[in-house]
From Swiss-Prot:
GO terms for cellular component: cytosol; nucleus; plasma membrane. Pfam families: C2 (PF00168). Changing residue 5 to A: Abolishes binding to YCHF1, but no effect on phospholipid binding. Ca(2+) 2 binds at residues 23, 28, 74-76. Changing residue 149 to A: Abolishes phospholipid binding, but no effect on binding to YCHF1. Residues 1-105 form the C2 domain. This is GTPase activating protein 1. Disulfide bonds: none annotated. Changing residue 119 to A: Abolishes phospholipid binding, but no effect on binding to YCHF1. Ca(2+) 1 binds at residues 22-23, 74, 76, 81. One of its GO terms (biological process) is defense response. Changing residue 28 to A: Abolishes phospholipid binding, but no effect on binding to YCHF1.
């Protein structure tokens, strides 16, 4: 299987902002991150619509064209309530990785991705080099819900011995 991987993406689910209320005056939110058959989950943060997760989840990348999908839920005793979803295209991040940029100052911005009708970006997303790593800061507007945004930070990780991107 390792031969098919092109790299890893560390997805830091930083926080939720103004998430929907699904319980009495609040929610107990968590995020599921999916890519292809992979499914990862943050911890549940109790009684808040502005959770601070800072949970780091790692996705194995085989095909960068497959979008990363986020689903936000309110943890309940019986059935968890949906609190919105979003998709993220990681191809812009991979394009910067392919440039193999070296020797630049920390936090040098290499690319910006602007919000449009084809993506879930709430604001411009920057891809930059930090400590020799390619990173991307993202704020996603949740769909299929009245309100809410999720802040992420992505970081590309090369796999020694893989074919790379």
């Amino acid at each position: 299987m390792l031969g098919h991987l092109v790299g890893l993406v560390k997805v830091r689910v930083v926080r939720g902002v103004n998430l929907a209320v699904r319980d009495l005056r609040s929610s107990d939110p968590y995020v599921i991150v999916r890519m292809g058959k992979q499914k990862l989950k943050t911890r549940v943060i109790k009684k808040t619509t502005n959770p601070e997760w800072n949970d780091e989840l790692t996705l194995s990348i085989e095909d960068p064209a497959v979008p990363v999908r986020l689903e936000v839920y309110d943890k309940d005793t019986f059935i968890d309530d949906a609190m919105g979803n979003a998709e993220l295209d990681i191809r812009p991040l991979v394009e910067v990785v392919k440039m193999k940029i070296e020797g630049v100052a920390d936090n040098t911005v290499v690319k910006k991705v602007v919000p449009n009708r084809q993506n879930c970006l709430a604001e411009e997303s920057t891809i930059y080099i930090s400590e020799g790593k390619v990173k991307q800061d993202v704020v996603l507007r949740l769909r299929d819900v009245e309100c809410g945004e999720i802040e992420l930070q992505l970081q590309w990780v090369d796999i020694p011995g893989s074919k790379g991107v």
